[in-house]
Amino acid sequence: MKQLEELLSTSFDIQFNDLTLLETAFTHTSYANEHRLLNVSHNERLEFLGDAVLQLIISEYLFAKYPKKTEGDMSKLRSMIVREESLAGFSRFCSFDAYIKLGKGEEKSGGRRRDTILGDLFEAFLGALLLDKGIDAVRRFLKQVMIPQVEKGNFERVKDYKTCLQEFLQAKGDVVIDYQVISEKGPAHAKQFEVSIVVNGAVLSKGLGKSKKLAEQDAAKNALAQLSEV
């Protein structure tokens, strides 16, 4: 953890008072499960808190920054900023992926590169920072890490995968696209949805996410990847 402390101090001017919070934020459930006898805490509860404060701060920013945008436009832009893929990218940008504690199985299966894990890690860090330093510290961190990318318009230029898939398929003729929830697992604060895309009665692809919307986006992303290979 010493190297992580140095990274946060030198790169972001953040010094945690409660290092237990920081360590918990960087501990995945797979690691905690493999060390149950040591009563190791994992980051899911901090992730829940971080998700909430991230939504609030980004909503505040968009409301102030874009006085002429509609509620729908702001919601769509916010969803692109806080989606799993974006948060995983910010984790990598901050080099957080090098410090997360994973179980042996998760490590071997490539968990350190997985967007789901890295996106959750970013949210968990925000939750820990909120508890340790307060919401203004979270705002400063996001202003340093996330807001510059929003200012550049990077997220406004990105179409959501569902829209891209719909345009791709409709260009080839009349199609009926249906998103169906296959399963819903996990506790209320850490749901995992699986969704399938059914096109003209046939399953095209499946996707996973922490909400139905995220699972639908993942399924659409997978469908576009499959179609590009055809």
From Swiss-Prot:
InterPro entries documented for this protein: dsRBD_dom, RNase_III, RNase_III_dom, RNase_III_sf
Disulfide bonds, paired cysteine numbers: none
Reaction catalyzed: Endonucleolytic cleavage to 5'-phosphomonoester
CDD domains (alphabetical): DSRM_RNAse_III_family, RIBOc
SUPFAM superfamilies: dsRNA-binding domain-like, RNase III domain-like
RNase III domain location: 1-134
Domain of life according to the entry: Bacteria
Protein name listed in UniProt: Ribonuclease 3
Organism for this UniProt entry: Streptococcus pyogenes serotype M2 (strain MGAS10270)
Encoding gene (name): rnc
